[in-house]
Structure formats: structure tokens, C-alpha cells
Amino acid sequence: MRIVLVGPPGAGKGTQAAYLAQNLSIPHIATGDLFRANISQGTDLGKQARAYMDAGQLVPDEVTIGMAKDRMAQADAAGGFLLDGFPRNVGQAEALDVMLKDEGVKLDAVLDLEVPEDEVVKRIAGRRVCRNNSAHVFHLTYNPPKAEGVCDACGGELYQRDDDSEETVRTRLEVYHTQTEPIIDYYRAQGLVVTISALGKVADVTARAMEALKASDEG
């Protein structure tokens, strides 16, 4: 299957993408991984991306599209893929359609992970990270430390990252509504959108997604 995964920040896209890709035996292609790989390997696209990032500018669509095209041309993606973080706007979605058409294939589904805005804020703003080890992550509601403000693993101080503040989260949601939500309308017009609730346990959401994808494939 060829799938695009969409959803607001805090919807658990990365987690679900990993499980779904494994269950479907297709590669999980994440924008962040594409950028890191191209930059670390010193590709032409990586150098272009690095120059924009170092200048504090947004990387142009054509660079991101080029990276995605190169990745989808690799052998492991011949039978399908799961895109996470791409396309990010309608222009990228249109470019993806052209790419796939040139290869004589098309998308099978666009999986939309739906989470209420207040839940997104709660999920992200509740995170607390250890100052000694950023891999030690807690949550005030879902995974609270035994002692308030103290890391269970090493006793380090727990703090809220700037990116996790409610103000920042709401700004990110605004960007999502403005830039990424129109993609859902674009694909809905093609009859590709499959919407599921991303509330509940990770395994339950994965099962819900697999069932919805199977139904859309059969339909």
C-alpha cells in the first residue's frame, strides 16, 4: 500500500507510522529522517537544505520534493510506503501525484489521525524532560514521576521544553490548520481520506488504523 499519514502535532504520528509500516511490511518515510540522511551524506539536496536551515530560512518545496522522490525510488519502496510529514502542503501533494503518475502508480489511502485540540495541548504541554538525560521523558497525566519535578531514573530536575509550552503548541496547531489541513480536503476530493480517532492506547489506535486501511483497500 501507498499511504500518506496526516494529523496534528501530538497525534502520535511517528509512533503509529512505525507500527503500521511494520505491520504492512512497507518503509516508513519521515521528512525528518530524509533531511538528516541527505545532510549527513552530503548530497546536493542535503547541501541545499543545510544552506537554507543555517540561514534560518524554510527549505523550499522543490528540495523536500526532490528528497522524497529519491527515497521513493529506492528498491524497498517499490511495493509501497508510508509517508509521514510529506506532503506538508497542497503544492507538495500535487507534486506527489505527478511523481506517482509518472511511475504508473497512485496513493491507496490518506490516514487522518483525529485528536481534539485540547487533547493535543494536554499531551504536549504535559511532557517533562530530565535535564541530565533528554531520553528520560515523563508526563504529568499519563506517566507522572514518583516525586514531582524529579526524574525517577537519575534524580535529575524535570523541566518543560520551550517547544512544549501551551503557547507554542497552539501556534503549531495554527500552522497545521493553515498549511496542512487543506491537504485533507485535497485528498478527500479524490476519495482517499480515511479518518480515525487517535485517542486511547497505542495498540488500540494501531488496530483501528489497520482495520480502516483494510476496509478502504477492499472498498
Curated annotation (Swiss-Prot):
Q: What residue stretch is flagged as signal peptide? A: none
| Record field: catalytic activity | AMP + ATP = 2 ADP
Q: Name one GO molecular function term.
A: ATP binding
**Biological pathway:** Purine metabolism; AMP biosynthesis via salvage pathway; AMP from ADP: step 1/1
Respond yes or no to whether keyword Transcription regulation is given for this record: no
Q: Where in the cell is it found?
A: Cytoplasm
Annotated region (NMP) at 30-59
Which domain of life does this protein belong to? Bacteria
The UniProt record gives the binding positions of ATP as 10-15, 127, 137-138, 200
Q: Which GO terms describe its biological process?
A: AMP salvage
Query: What EC designation does it have?
Result: 2.7.4.3
GO CC terms of this entry: cytoplasm
- Binding annotation for AMP: 31, 36, 57-59, 85-88, 92, 161, 172
Using the UniProt annotation, give all residue ranges assigned to the region (LID). 126-164
Q: Give coiled-coil spans as residue ranges.
A: none
A single Pfam family it belongs to is ADK
Q: What is its main location?
A: cytoplasm
Q: Which UniProt keywords apply?
A: ATP-binding, Cytoplasm, Kinase, Nucleotide biosynthesis, Nucleotide-binding, Transferase
Description of how the protein assembles with itself and partners: Monomer.
Family membership noted in the UniProt record: Belongs to the adenylate kinase family.
* PANTHER family (UniProt xref): NUCLEOTIDE KINASE
Domain comment (free text)? Consists of three domains, a large central CORE domain and two small peripheral domains, NMPbind and LID, which undergo movements during catalysis. The LID domain closes over the site of phosphoryl transfer upon ATP binding. Assembling and dissambling the active center during each catalytic cycle provides an effective means to prevent ATP hydrolysis.
- Function of the protein: Catalyzes the reversible transfer of the terminal phosphate group between ATP and AMP. Plays an important role in cellular energy homeostasis and in adenine nucleotide metabolism.
Name the UniProt record assigns to this protein: Adenylate kinase
- Origin organism is Streptomyces griseus subsp. griseus (strain JCM 4626 / CBS 651.72 / NBRC 13350 / KCC S-0626 / ISP 5235)
